A protein has these predicted regions:
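Positively charged, polar, low-complexity stretches
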Residues: 1-85
Length: 85
């Protein structure tokens, strides 16, 4: 299981750094690249997103775009499961 703790996010750079820690082969710094990474996962992967409210506070409207992208990636890749806690 991979854990993304949104309490550590103060800006977009933090967001993409944390995703890079969760997914070592991730090299992009935008939502399109992250979407490509998540939809190309070839083994079962669980991502737990903690403290989502902190992301909303730090990222503002960008957090909405992030959540839409995460939900889309989960719908497109049956091997990806995302939990928000």
């Amino acid at each position: 299981m991979k854990i993304l703790d949104c309490a550590q996010i103060q800006n977009r750079d933090d967001l993409f750094r944390l995703f890079g820690e969760c997914f070592p082969h991730y090299i992009g710094h935008n939502l399109d690249a992250l979407h490509d990474q998540l939809t190309s996962l070839s083994s079962p992967t669980e991502l737990t997103v903690q403290n989502w409210a902190a992301a909303e506070e730090s990222l503002g409207r960008y957090a909405n775009a992030l959540k839409r992208m995460l939900n889309d990636a989960e719908a497109e890749n049956p091997l990806l499961t995302i939990h928000y806690i």
